[in-house]
Amino acid sequence: MVTRAGAGAAVAATAVVALLSAALALYRPPLDAVLERAFSLRKVHSIKDMENTLQLVRNIIPPLSSTKHKGQDGRIGVVGGCQEYTGAPYFAAISALKVGADLSHVFCASAAAPVIKAYSPELIVHPVLDSPSAVDEVEKWLPRLHALVFHCERGTQPGFLFWQGILEASKARDIPVVIDADGLWLVAQQPALIQGYQKAVLTPNHMEFSRLYDAVLRGPVDSDDRHGSVLRLSQALGNVTVVQKGERDILSNGQQVLVCSQEGSSRRCGGQGDLLSGSLGVLVHWALLAGPEKTNGGMLDLKLTIWGPKIETGIKTRAQGGCGPRTTAPTSPHLPLSPSPQVQPSPGGCIRRLLSHQAVQPPSLPEARSLHHHLRHDRRGGGRLPQAL
Protein backbone atom coordinates (compact mmCIF):
# COMPACT_ATOMS: atom_id res chain seq x y z
CA MET A 1 0.00 0.00 0.00
CA VAL A 2 1.09 3.57 -0.45
CA THR A 3 2.54 5.48 2.47
CA ARG A 4 0.49 8.17 4.14
CA ALA A 5 2.99 10.75 2.88
CA GLY A 6 2.74 9.26 -0.58
CA ALA A 7 -1.03 9.29 -0.35
CA GLY A 8 -1.04 12.98 0.52
CA ALA A 9 1.25 13.77 -2.38
CA ALA A 10 -0.84 11.65 -4.70
CA VAL A 11 -3.98 13.52 -3.71
CA ALA A 12 -2.19 16.82 -4.34
CA ALA A 13 -1.22 15.80 -7.83
CA THR A 14 -4.59 14.22 -8.47
CA ALA A 15 -6.48 17.35 -7.49
CA VAL A 16 -4.57 19.67 -9.81
CA VAL A 17 -4.41 17.49 -12.90
CA ALA A 18 -7.89 16.04 -12.46
CA LEU A 19 -9.42 19.49 -12.14
CA LEU A 20 -7.78 20.45 -15.40
CA SER A 21 -9.14 17.36 -17.13
CA ALA A 22 -12.62 17.98 -15.76
CA ALA A 23 -12.59 21.50 -17.14
CA LEU A 24 -11.56 20.24 -20.57
CA ALA A 25 -14.56 17.97 -20.73
CA LEU A 26 -17.32 20.29 -19.71
CA TYR A 27 -16.58 23.50 -21.52
CA ARG A 28 -16.21 22.96 -25.23
CA PRO A 29 -16.22 26.61 -26.45
CA PRO A 30 -13.33 27.75 -24.21
CA LEU A 31 -11.51 24.50 -24.90
CA ASP A 32 -11.77 25.00 -28.65
CA ALA A 33 -10.50 28.56 -28.29
CA VAL A 34 -7.57 27.57 -26.13
CA LEU A 35 -6.49 24.42 -27.95
CA GLU A 36 -7.81 25.14 -31.45
CA ARG A 37 -4.57 24.20 -33.13
CA ALA A 38 -4.28 20.89 -31.31
CA PHE A 39 -7.79 19.54 -30.99
CA SER A 40 -10.21 18.10 -33.54
CA LEU A 41 -13.07 15.61 -33.31
CA ARG A 42 -12.18 11.92 -33.24
CA LYS A 43 -8.49 12.63 -32.98
CA VAL A 44 -6.02 11.55 -30.34
CA HIS A 45 -4.27 14.32 -28.46
CA SER A 46 -1.36 14.06 -26.09
CA ILE A 47 -1.45 16.80 -23.49
CA LYS A 48 1.76 17.75 -21.75
CA ASP A 49 1.79 21.54 -21.54
CA MET A 50 -1.69 22.90 -20.81
CA GLU A 51 -0.73 26.19 -19.22
CA ASN A 52 -3.37 28.03 -21.23
CA THR A 53 -6.11 25.79 -19.88
CA LEU A 54 -5.25 26.25 -16.22
CA GLN A 55 -7.69 29.15 -16.03
CA LEU A 56 -10.44 26.64 -16.74
CA VAL A 57 -9.22 24.67 -13.76
CA ARG A 58 -9.20 27.71 -11.50
CA ASN A 59 -12.67 28.65 -12.66
CA ILE A 60 -14.32 25.48 -11.40
CA ILE A 61 -12.78 25.57 -7.92
CA PRO A 62 -15.60 27.03 -5.81
CA PRO A 63 -14.47 29.98 -3.69
CA LEU A 64 -15.01 29.86 0.03
CA SER A 65 -17.50 32.32 1.44
CA SER A 66 -19.00 33.09 4.83
CA THR A 67 -22.43 32.92 3.20
CA LYS A 68 -22.09 29.23 2.34
CA HIS A 69 -23.48 26.42 4.43
CA LYS A 70 -21.96 23.06 5.32
CA GLY A 71 -22.07 20.66 2.41
CA GLN A 72 -22.50 23.20 -0.35
CA ASP A 73 -19.07 22.49 -1.84
CA GLY A 74 -19.59 18.77 -2.05
CA ARG A 75 -21.40 15.90 -0.36
CA ILE A 76 -19.96 12.68 -1.74
CA GLY A 77 -21.09 9.11 -1.15
CA VAL A 78 -18.88 6.03 -1.45
CA VAL A 79 -20.59 2.63 -1.81
CA GLY A 80 -18.50 -0.36 -0.77
CA GLY A 81 -16.61 -1.99 2.04
CA CYS A 82 -16.82 -5.37 3.72
CA GLN A 83 -14.93 -7.18 6.46
CA GLU A 84 -12.07 -8.10 4.13
CA TYR A 85 -11.88 -4.80 2.27
CA THR A 86 -12.00 -1.60 4.28
CA GLY A 87 -9.15 0.34 2.69
CA ALA A 88 -10.61 1.15 -0.73
CA PRO A 89 -13.75 2.97 0.45
CA TYR A 90 -11.72 4.77 3.10
CA PHE A 91 -9.17 6.05 0.59
CA ALA A 92 -11.90 7.15 -1.82
CA ALA A 93 -13.88 8.95 0.87
CA ILE A 94 -10.92 10.63 2.53
CA SER A 95 -9.56 11.74 -0.87
CA ALA A 96 -12.83 13.52 -1.59
CA LEU A 97 -12.41 15.42 1.67
CA LYS A 98 -8.76 16.23 0.99
CA VAL A 99 -9.58 17.59 -2.45
CA GLY A 100 -12.18 19.89 -0.91
CA ALA A 101 -15.56 18.22 -0.39
CA ASP A 102 -17.39 19.27 2.76
CA LEU A 103 -18.90 15.91 3.68
CA SER A 104 -18.05 12.34 2.77
CA HIS A 105 -20.34 9.35 3.37
CA VAL A 106 -19.44 5.66 3.24
CA PHE A 107 -22.17 3.05 2.75
CA CYS A 108 -20.66 -0.29 3.73
CA ALA A 109 -21.36 -3.66 5.34
CA SER A 110 -21.81 -3.70 9.10
CA ALA A 111 -18.55 -5.57 9.70
CA ALA A 112 -16.58 -2.85 7.91
CA ALA A 113 -18.19 0.14 9.59
CA PRO A 114 -16.24 0.20 12.89
CA VAL A 115 -12.94 -0.17 11.05
CA ILE A 116 -13.63 2.58 8.51
CA LYS A 117 -15.00 4.87 11.20
CA ALA A 118 -11.88 4.30 13.27
CA TYR A 119 -9.72 5.41 10.35
CA SER A 120 -11.17 8.93 10.46
CA PRO A 121 -13.81 10.68 12.55
CA GLU A 122 -14.51 12.95 9.55
CA LEU A 123 -16.27 10.18 7.63
CA ILE A 124 -20.00 9.54 7.99
CA VAL A 125 -20.31 5.75 7.95
CA HIS A 126 -23.55 3.86 7.27
CA PRO A 127 -23.46 0.08 8.00
CA VAL A 128 -26.29 -0.82 5.61
CA LEU A 129 -25.04 -2.86 2.65
CA ASP A 130 -25.75 -6.24 4.25
CA SER A 131 -29.24 -5.19 5.29
CA PRO A 132 -32.30 -6.51 3.41
CA SER A 133 -33.34 -2.87 3.02
CA ALA A 134 -29.94 -1.70 1.72
CA VAL A 135 -31.34 0.00 -1.39
CA ASP A 136 -33.91 1.93 0.62
CA GLU A 137 -31.32 2.88 3.25
CA VAL A 138 -28.99 4.35 0.62
CA GLU A 139 -31.76 5.85 -1.49
CA LYS A 140 -33.05 8.01 1.34
CA TRP A 141 -29.65 9.75 1.41
CA LEU A 142 -29.46 10.38 -2.34
CA PRO A 143 -31.26 13.76 -2.24
CA ARG A 144 -28.43 14.99 -0.01
CA LEU A 145 -25.55 13.75 -2.19
CA HIS A 146 -23.88 15.39 -5.18
CA ALA A 147 -22.07 12.30 -6.51
CA LEU A 148 -21.64 8.59 -5.78
CA VAL A 149 -18.47 6.52 -6.03
CA PHE A 150 -19.01 2.76 -6.36
CA HIS A 151 -16.36 0.53 -4.79
CA CYS A 152 -18.42 -2.62 -4.34
CA GLU A 153 -16.43 -5.75 -3.52
CA ARG A 154 -17.63 -9.17 -4.55
CA GLY A 155 -16.93 -10.24 -0.99
CA THR A 156 -19.91 -8.15 0.10
CA GLN A 157 -22.48 -10.55 -1.31
CA PRO A 158 -25.72 -9.02 0.01
CA GLY A 159 -24.54 -5.47 -0.65
CA PHE A 160 -23.25 -6.43 -4.07
CA LEU A 161 -26.65 -7.79 -5.04
CA PHE A 162 -28.22 -4.45 -4.10
CA TRP A 163 -25.69 -2.47 -6.13
CA GLN A 164 -27.92 -2.48 -9.19
CA GLY A 165 -30.82 -0.97 -7.28
CA ILE A 166 -28.62 1.76 -5.82
CA LEU A 167 -27.24 2.63 -9.25
CA GLU A 168 -30.69 2.76 -10.80
CA ALA A 169 -31.88 5.06 -8.00
CA SER A 170 -28.87 7.32 -8.58
CA LYS A 171 -29.57 7.52 -12.30
CA ALA A 172 -33.20 8.34 -11.64
CA ARG A 173 -32.04 11.39 -9.65
CA ASP A 174 -29.46 12.34 -12.30
CA ILE A 175 -26.59 11.94 -9.83
CA PRO A 176 -23.09 11.59 -11.34
CA VAL A 177 -21.50 8.22 -10.60
CA VAL A 178 -17.88 7.08 -10.63
CA ILE A 179 -17.46 3.32 -10.98
CA ASP A 180 -14.26 1.51 -10.02
CA ALA A 181 -13.02 -1.86 -8.78
CA ASP A 182 -15.68 -4.59 -8.66
CA GLY A 183 -18.29 -2.11 -9.76
CA LEU A 184 -16.62 -2.47 -13.15
CA TRP A 185 -17.00 -6.24 -12.91
CA LEU A 186 -20.75 -5.83 -12.51
CA VAL A 187 -20.89 -3.43 -15.47
CA ALA A 188 -19.10 -6.08 -17.53
CA GLN A 189 -21.81 -8.57 -16.52
CA GLN A 190 -24.66 -6.13 -17.19
CA PRO A 191 -23.55 -3.29 -19.52
CA ALA A 192 -27.13 -2.07 -19.78
CA LEU A 193 -26.80 -0.74 -16.23
CA ILE A 194 -24.90 2.32 -17.43
CA GLN A 195 -25.76 2.25 -21.14
CA GLY A 196 -26.21 5.84 -22.32
CA TYR A 197 -25.84 7.38 -18.86
CA GLN A 198 -23.38 10.13 -19.70
CA LYS A 199 -22.87 11.18 -16.10
CA ALA A 200 -21.11 7.89 -15.45
CA VAL A 201 -17.32 7.71 -15.32
CA LEU A 202 -15.60 4.32 -15.53
CA THR A 203 -12.00 4.06 -14.28
CA PRO A 204 -10.66 0.65 -15.37
CA ASN A 205 -7.07 -0.48 -15.16
CA HIS A 206 -5.59 -2.64 -17.92
CA MET A 207 -7.22 -5.91 -16.88
CA GLU A 208 -10.56 -4.33 -16.02
CA PHE A 209 -10.61 -2.57 -19.37
CA SER A 210 -9.94 -5.81 -21.24
CA ARG A 211 -12.81 -7.49 -19.38
CA LEU A 212 -15.18 -4.63 -20.15
CA TYR A 213 -14.16 -4.45 -23.80
CA ASP A 214 -14.66 -8.16 -24.35
CA ALA A 215 -18.05 -8.13 -22.62
CA VAL A 216 -19.39 -5.13 -24.53
CA LEU A 217 -17.76 -5.49 -27.96
CA ARG A 218 -17.44 -9.28 -28.01
CA GLY A 219 -13.80 -9.37 -28.90
CA PRO A 220 -10.29 -8.80 -27.57
CA VAL A 221 -8.70 -5.38 -27.25
CA ASP A 222 -6.52 -4.35 -30.18
CA SER A 223 -3.17 -3.92 -28.44
CA ASP A 224 -1.90 -1.89 -31.41
CA ASP A 225 -4.75 0.61 -31.17
CA ARG A 226 -5.34 1.38 -27.51
CA HIS A 227 -6.68 4.83 -28.28
CA GLY A 228 -9.24 3.49 -30.71
CA SER A 229 -10.19 0.74 -28.28
CA VAL A 230 -11.05 3.24 -25.55
CA LEU A 231 -13.03 5.32 -28.04
CA ARG A 232 -14.97 2.30 -29.28
CA LEU A 233 -15.84 1.12 -25.77
CA SER A 234 -17.12 4.55 -24.82
CA GLN A 235 -19.21 4.73 -27.97
CA ALA A 236 -20.61 1.24 -27.45
CA LEU A 237 -21.73 2.22 -23.95
CA GLY A 238 -23.49 5.34 -25.23
CA ASN A 239 -20.70 7.89 -24.78
CA VAL A 240 -20.01 7.06 -21.16
CA THR A 241 -16.67 8.53 -20.07
CA VAL A 242 -13.96 5.87 -19.91
CA VAL A 243 -10.62 6.43 -18.19
CA GLN A 244 -8.14 3.67 -18.91
CA LYS A 245 -5.44 4.02 -16.29
CA GLY A 246 -1.88 3.16 -17.16
CA GLU A 247 1.53 4.53 -18.04
CA ARG A 248 -0.40 6.95 -20.23
CA ASP A 249 -3.97 7.53 -19.21
CA ILE A 250 -6.33 7.28 -22.18
CA LEU A 251 -9.60 9.14 -21.78
CA SER A 252 -12.61 9.17 -24.08
CA ASN A 253 -16.20 10.33 -24.01
CA GLY A 254 -17.01 8.65 -27.31
CA GLN A 255 -16.29 11.77 -29.33
CA GLN A 256 -12.73 12.68 -28.47
CA VAL A 257 -9.74 10.81 -27.14
CA LEU A 258 -7.32 12.50 -24.78
CA VAL A 259 -4.01 11.00 -23.74
CA CYS A 260 -2.36 12.38 -20.64
CA SER A 261 1.27 11.39 -20.43
CA GLN A 262 2.38 13.49 -17.48
CA GLU A 263 4.49 11.20 -15.34
CA GLY A 264 3.32 10.22 -11.88
CA SER A 265 4.93 7.89 -9.39
CA SER A 266 6.77 4.85 -10.70
CA ARG A 267 5.37 2.80 -7.83
CA ARG A 268 2.32 0.67 -8.54
CA CYS A 269 0.56 -0.36 -5.38
CA GLY A 270 -2.83 -0.66 -3.79
CA GLY A 271 -4.83 2.47 -3.06
CA GLN A 272 -3.81 4.67 -5.99
CA GLY A 273 -6.97 4.09 -8.01
CA ASP A 274 -9.06 4.76 -4.92
CA LEU A 275 -7.51 8.21 -4.61
CA LEU A 276 -8.54 8.86 -8.21
CA SER A 277 -12.13 7.74 -7.88
CA GLY A 278 -12.72 9.63 -4.65
CA SER A 279 -11.24 12.80 -6.10
CA LEU A 280 -13.36 12.42 -9.21
CA GLY A 281 -16.52 12.34 -7.15
CA VAL A 282 -16.08 15.86 -5.83
CA LEU A 283 -14.58 17.19 -9.06
CA VAL A 284 -17.65 16.11 -11.03
CA HIS A 285 -19.78 18.14 -8.65
CA TRP A 286 -17.50 21.18 -8.85
CA ALA A 287 -17.44 21.12 -12.65
CA LEU A 288 -21.23 20.95 -12.87
CA LEU A 289 -21.61 23.55 -10.13
CA ALA A 290 -19.38 26.06 -11.94
CA GLY A 291 -21.91 26.64 -14.73
CA PRO A 292 -21.53 28.50 -18.05
CA GLU A 293 -20.71 31.82 -16.39
CA LYS A 294 -17.31 30.42 -15.49
CA THR A 295 -16.49 29.85 -19.15
CA ASN A 296 -17.03 33.34 -20.55
CA GLY A 297 -20.49 32.46 -21.79
CA GLY A 298 -19.70 28.90 -22.86
CA MET A 299 -22.70 26.57 -22.60
CA LEU A 300 -22.46 23.48 -20.45
CA ASP A 301 -22.41 20.46 -22.76
CA LEU A 302 -23.92 17.57 -20.83
CA LYS A 303 -23.09 15.17 -23.66
CA LEU A 304 -19.47 15.57 -22.74
CA THR A 305 -20.20 15.52 -18.98
CA ILE A 306 -16.63 15.09 -17.85
CA TRP A 307 -13.30 13.76 -18.98
CA GLY A 308 -11.94 11.19 -16.65
CA PRO A 309 -8.91 12.83 -15.11
CA LYS A 310 -5.33 11.82 -15.22
CA ILE A 311 -4.37 10.76 -11.72
CA GLU A 312 -0.91 11.52 -10.53
CA THR A 313 -0.51 8.17 -8.82
CA GLY A 314 1.85 9.70 -6.34
CA ILE A 315 4.91 11.88 -6.30
CA LYS A 316 7.77 9.93 -4.80
CA THR A 317 7.77 10.27 -1.07
CA ARG A 318 10.60 11.84 0.82
CA ALA A 319 10.59 8.92 3.20
CA GLN A 320 13.53 6.68 2.26
CA GLY A 321 13.73 8.18 -1.21
CA GLY A 322 10.24 7.04 -2.15
CA CYS A 323 10.70 3.51 -0.85
CA GLY A 324 9.09 3.87 2.52
CA PRO A 325 6.93 1.29 4.25
CA ARG A 326 4.05 -0.02 2.15
CA THR A 327 1.25 1.07 4.40
CA THR A 328 -1.44 3.65 4.50
CA ALA A 329 -2.58 2.80 7.99
CA PRO A 330 -3.59 5.83 10.07
CA THR A 331 -0.87 4.91 12.54
CA SER A 332 1.85 5.47 9.95
CA PRO A 333 4.55 7.64 11.50
CA HIS A 334 5.16 9.41 8.18
CA LEU A 335 2.00 11.52 8.23
CA PRO A 336 0.13 12.24 11.47
CA LEU A 337 -3.65 12.50 11.37
CA SER A 338 -3.46 16.14 12.45
CA PRO A 339 -0.87 18.70 11.33
CA SER A 340 1.78 19.23 13.93
CA PRO A 341 1.70 22.77 15.38
CA GLN A 342 5.49 22.78 15.22
CA VAL A 343 5.44 22.37 11.45
CA GLN A 344 4.95 25.45 9.28
CA PRO A 345 3.78 24.22 5.86
CA SER A 346 5.34 25.54 2.69
CA PRO A 347 2.32 26.88 0.78
CA GLY A 348 1.37 24.71 -2.16
CA GLY A 349 4.84 23.38 -2.87
CA CYS A 350 3.89 20.21 -4.72
CA ILE A 351 0.99 21.97 -6.47
CA ARG A 352 3.30 24.76 -7.58
CA ARG A 353 5.68 22.29 -9.21
CA LEU A 354 2.83 20.62 -11.05
CA LEU A 355 1.44 23.89 -12.37
CA SER A 356 4.83 25.07 -13.59
CA HIS A 357 5.71 21.66 -15.10
CA GLN A 358 9.10 21.79 -13.45
CA ALA A 359 10.98 18.63 -12.66
CA VAL A 360 9.06 17.05 -9.83
CA GLN A 361 11.01 16.65 -6.64
CA PRO A 362 9.79 14.68 -3.65
CA PRO A 363 7.41 16.90 -1.68
CA SER A 364 8.15 17.58 1.93
CA LEU A 365 5.82 16.14 4.52
CA PRO A 366 4.57 19.62 5.49
CA GLU A 367 3.67 20.19 1.85
CA ALA A 368 1.68 16.99 1.72
CA ARG A 369 -0.03 17.79 5.01
CA SER A 370 -1.02 21.26 3.86
CA LEU A 371 -2.82 20.15 0.68
CA HIS A 372 -6.28 20.20 2.20
CA HIS A 373 -5.67 23.64 3.69
CA HIS A 374 -4.68 25.18 0.37
CA LEU A 375 -7.41 23.57 -1.69
CA ARG A 376 -10.08 24.70 0.74
CA HIS A 377 -8.74 27.91 2.27
CA ASP A 378 -6.86 29.50 -0.63
CA ARG A 379 -9.97 29.72 -2.81
CA ARG A 380 -11.21 33.09 -1.66
CA GLY A 381 -10.02 34.91 -4.76
CA GLY A 382 -12.95 33.97 -6.97
CA GLY A 383 -11.98 30.35 -7.20
CA ARG A 384 -8.40 31.03 -8.24
CA LEU A 385 -5.43 29.25 -6.85
CA PRO A 386 -3.02 31.59 -5.05
CA GLN A 387 -0.74 33.54 -7.34
CA ALA A 388 2.15 32.31 -5.23
CA LEU A 389 1.64 28.91 -6.77
Swiss-Prot record:
Its EC number is 4.2.1.93. It is an enzyme of class 4 (lyase). (6S)-NADPHX binds at E153, N205, H206, M207, E208, F209, S210, R211, D274. Residues 53-389 form the YjeF C-terminal domain. This protein may be expected to contain an N-terminal transit peptide but none has been predicted. Catalyzes the dehydration of the S-form of NAD(P)HX at the expense of ATP, which is converted to ADP. Together with NAD(P)HX epimerase, which catalyzes the epimerization of the S- and R-forms, the enzyme allows the repair of both epimers of NAD(P)HX, a damaged form of NAD(P)H that is a result of enzymatic or heat-dependent hydration. Belongs to the NnrD/CARKD family. This is ATP-dependent (S)-NAD(P)H-hydrate dehydratase.
